[in-house]
């Protein structure tokens, strides 16, 4: 199941997967792709060595075809890894947003206003007691509530 489907299920509440588990799944997928790519690179080197040791043109052509196919697979993997890293970054931002809105939500439940005041103080870079758009955007990009 693609990571976005897991994430959607997590947000919609129809699974027990947590955001940290979703991040771990993305990390695992990236590690698996890197391992696969290393295997392809080994196979490419082996095919190049075998090609270089033969004088039969048909065999050389066959090795060249194999090398091209393996290189194409490596290229696909190298395109997928940045996409997965972007997904991981989006999930991390979601975790920050859930924390932020959880703190705001706790006010409705009568929980300590001090929690939100402390959060605002941590994010408020210019010390004027408010979180402006730039500060909020920075908090959401970094996933960090403490800019100081």
Swiss-Prot record:
Keyword Chloroplast found:
no
User: SMART domains under this entry?
Assistant: EFh
Domain called EF-hand: residue spans: 111-146
Pfam short name (any one): EF-hand_1
Q: Which UniProt keywords apply?
A: Calcium, Coiled coil
Q: Keyword check for Secreted, yes or no.
A: no
> Which residue windows are coiled coil?
17-61
Q: Name one GO molecular function term.
A: calcium ion binding
User: What SUPFAM superfamilies does UniProt report for this protein, alphabetically?
Assistant: EF-hand
The scientific name of the source species is Arabidopsis thaliana
PROSITE patterns listed in its UniProt record: EF_HAND_2
Provide the function of this protein. Answer: Potential calcium sensor.
**Name of this protein:** Probable calcium-binding protein CML1
So which domain of life are we looking at? Eukaryota
**Induction (free text):** By touch and during darkness conditions.
């Amino acid at each position: 199941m693609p990571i976005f489907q897991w994430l959607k299920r997590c947000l919609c509440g129809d699974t027990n997967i947590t955001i940290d588990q979703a991040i771990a799944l993305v990390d695992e997928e990236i590690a698996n792709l890197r391992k696969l790519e290393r295997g392809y690179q080994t196979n490419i080197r082996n095919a190049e060595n075998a090609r270089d040791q033969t004088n039969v043109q048909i065999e050389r052509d066959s090795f060249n075809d194999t090398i091209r196919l393996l290189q194409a697979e490596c290229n696909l993997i190298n395109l997928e890894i940045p996409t997965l890293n972007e997904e991981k970054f989006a999930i991390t931002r979601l975790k920050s947003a859930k924390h932020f809105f959880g703190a705001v939500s706790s006010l409705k439940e009568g929980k300590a206003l001090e929690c939100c005041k402390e959060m605002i103080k941590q994010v408020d870079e210019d010390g004027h007691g408010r979180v402006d758009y730039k500060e909020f955007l920075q908090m959401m990009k970094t996933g960090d509530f403490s800019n100081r």
